Each structure stands twice: as structure tokens, then as C-alpha cells.
């Protein structure tokens, strides 16, 4: 269990606001700009754990004046990276062989980690250039 909840738990807007300290307007803005989506069930919008953590991170950025509109660049970048990684592993991910699919999912997680590290290094390099 993570944070007292079962894996795969869903969170209401109130849960997300309470657990992240985010302004409810910020969460609505993130939905409006497609940064998070949530899922409507019975007239109530629920968010996954990852979306809750996105709200937490954006809440930190909001303290520096970064809002939903500014986050399009991050969302677009993540979408492009996901498409690239999916295209690399698409045949294995579609395989009917459960072992091959499992290996592809593990490779996908590894590639995500490596690309995240690469992005971090490129950002640090560019920020150092700005600072000098």
C-alpha cells in the first residue's frame, strides 16, 4: 500500500487537494490544459496516483509562477517520448507471448529511466551555460 491506500487507488479532487496542498483551481487548470485527465464516475472525477503526484509537483512549480499554460511544453515532451519508446518496443508489447510482453514492459521501464536521466543531464548542462 502507498500512502495508506491500495495500489491503483483513485482520488477525488478533495483527496488530491488535501494530500498535496494544491489549490483546487490549479487542479482544474491542469485538467483544462490536459496535463491530467482524471476519470468521471457517477458525476465525480477521480484521479490516479500518478496524476496526484503530478499535481504535487506542479503545486511546487506554482510557487514560482508556473501555471497550467506553461506546462504544455512538459506534456508535449512527455507525449513525444512515450510515442518514441512505444514505437521502439511496439512489436514486443503487442506480442501474444506473455514472457515477451513482460520483457518489453521491463525494457520500457528501463528506457523511461534512462531517458529521464538523459533529459536531466541535458537540462543541467543548458542551465549551467545560462548561469555562466
Listing of model-derived features with the role each one plays in the protein:
Residues 1-132:
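Arg/Lys-rich, alpha-helical DNA-contact motif
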Amino acid at each position: 500500500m502507498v500512502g495508506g491506500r491500495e495500489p491503483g487507488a483513485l482520488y477525488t479532487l478533495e483527496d488530491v487537494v488535501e494530500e498535496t496542498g494544491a489549490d483546487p483551481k490549479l487542479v482544474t487548470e491542469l485538467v483544462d490544459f490536459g496535463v491530467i485527465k482524471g476519470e468521471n464516475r457517477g458525476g465525480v472525477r477521480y484521479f490516479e496516483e500518478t496524476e496526484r503526484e503530478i499535481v504535487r509537483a506542479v503545486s511546487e512549480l506554482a510557487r514560482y509562477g508556473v501555471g497550467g499554460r506553461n506546462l504544455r511544453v512538459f506534456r508535449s515532451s512527455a507525449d513525444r517520448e512515450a510515442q518514441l519508446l512505444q514505437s521502439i518496443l511496439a512489436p514486443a508489447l503487442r506480442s501474444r507471448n506473455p514472457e515477451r510482453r513482460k520483457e518489453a514492459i521491463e525494457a520500457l521501464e528501463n528506457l523511461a529511466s534512462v531517458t529521464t536521466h538523459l533529459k536531466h543531464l541535458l537540462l543541467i548542462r543548458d542551465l549551467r551555460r545560462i548561469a555562466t
